[in-house]
Amino acid sequence: MSGARTAPALFFLGCSALALGVSSASQEHREAEYYVAAVYEHPSVLSPNPLELVSRQEALELMKQNLDVYEQQVMAAAQKGVQIIVFPEDGIHGFNFTRTSIYPFLDFMPSPKLVRWNPCLEPFRFNDTEVLQRLSCMAIKGGMFLVANLGTKQPCLSSDPGCPQDGRYQFNTNVVFSDNGTLVDRYRKHNLYFEAAFDTPANVDLITFDTPFAGKFGVFTCFDILFFDPAVRLLRDFEVKHIVYPTAWMNQLPLLAAIEIQKAFATAFGVNVLAANIHHPTLGMTGSGIHTPLKSFWYHDMDDPKGHLIIAQVATNPQGLTGTGNTTSEMDPSHRKFLKILSGDPYCEKDAQEVHCDEAAKWNVNVPPTFHSEMMYDNFTLVPVWGTEGHLQVCSNSLCCHLLYERPTLSKELYALGVFDGLHTVHGTYYIQTCALVKCGGLGFDTCGQEITEAEGLFDFHLWGNFSTLYIFPLFLTSGMTLDTPDQLGWENDHYFLRKRGLSSGLVTAALYGRLYERK
């Protein structure tokens, strides 16, 4: 998505600023309800040879180029009244290092729980902390909370059974600075994604920090979003309403594009997610956003090599999209039909002359062929979505997925309803249950599951399944890498459903992505 598509974020901020100026009472009220956040998608300067061992000075010179850009963005954000800014994972030092070659890029990291420290005001307290000092000073200059990611080192003793042979731990670390430059806390990434340069902490860091403008925030990084620890545990145990999320995410369509999973997490848990991704389109890395459960301000651009700053007002108390919604008397016919299918009762429609009833078993008059195709490296079972309306079912193991749909017009495209209930084993191992309505890459069944970004097909639909987990992420992507929001989500008769009418652009993906964290 080009930067022009993110203009509503800045426009929303401008309109709100005008509203704030109406009266002092209005201003106090609005400031209590909203805060101003920023995320920066950064096209980082990378080491030309990350496998080569360089000096600390050479490493600092490369990182300075990225930190200079960070400071420019902080000052630009300060002009817009930003109170918290988030920068991406790997944005300062880059990636593809070995354990040895990354060492000159690492800062020493004292524990904020043991040491209260302001690196900008106390620069000589610890050696090898130049990056932390620079970030601390940025927070002071911008007068805002600042979240960034860097590599850190921590010496360990041979008596420590987990101590690596080289006598140090190396961590992929997020740091949080307050607006006065104090190091508030640090989070060490737990779920590493093929990162040989870093160690996994012995214990999961469950990190929250308090702000005067929005209360409590939680912190995690990139691949963590797919796992119970720390992401879900933070929300369950600490009543967190806001997440800061540095990431270096390579887009994987049709189910795990960066903005797609960011938005899904915000919607599933009813929280705000401030997500900053790295910007390297040639590597498939783009997609940042400020996501609330109901609205998103995002950036996705595979063409423009430049970075992008997103600024938006964010509710301090986000409102979620859950529940079964309207009463039966207010429901449209498609939702009444959906409820009848779930209950197994006949569905009746009244015309001018008489009432017509169909048994639930007869609603799916066209039973299309079942086929298999690879999607996201998993062997999905699918059925094609043909015709202007219908009710489809497809099952795998214990999961059955259903689609009740109407189409105002037929496009010259193939869509399919797919199901997968099993262990995902490529680029990570984790158990998923997925119901997915996707546009296929072509007209052949073997193209279903391919990566596509453009679509024309419009649907009004209910998508649901008998999931064995409560942790279900609603993925919703439309043509041109745009995000949409379901009209309704929730449980009905032990089935989880997603409902949508009136798509404004062609459907790329609508999916319910369930995670069974306890199964491995």
From Swiss-Prot:
Glycans are attached at residues 96, 127, 180, 326, 379, 466. InterPro entries: Biotinidase-like_euk (IPR012101), Biotinidase/VNN (IPR040154), C-N_Hydrolase (IPR003010), C-N_Hydrolase_sf (IPR036526), Vanin_C (IPR043957). Catalytic release of biotin from biocytin, the product of biotin-dependent carboxylases degradation. It catalyses: biocytin + H2O = biotin + L-lysine; biotin amide + H2O = biotin + NH4(+). This is Biotinidase. Coiled coil: none annotated. CDD domains: biotinidase_like. Belongs to the carbon-nitrogen hydrolase superfamily. BTD/VNN family. One of its GO terms (molecular function) is biotinidase activity. Its EC number is 3.5.1.12. It comes from the Eukaryota. It is found in: Secreted, Extracellular space. The gene is Btd. The keyword Signal applies. GO terms for biological process: biotin metabolic process. Pfam families: CN_hydrolase, Vanin_C. Residues 1-21 form the signal peptide. GO terms for cellular component: apical part of cell; extracellular region; extracellular space; nucleolus; perikaryon.
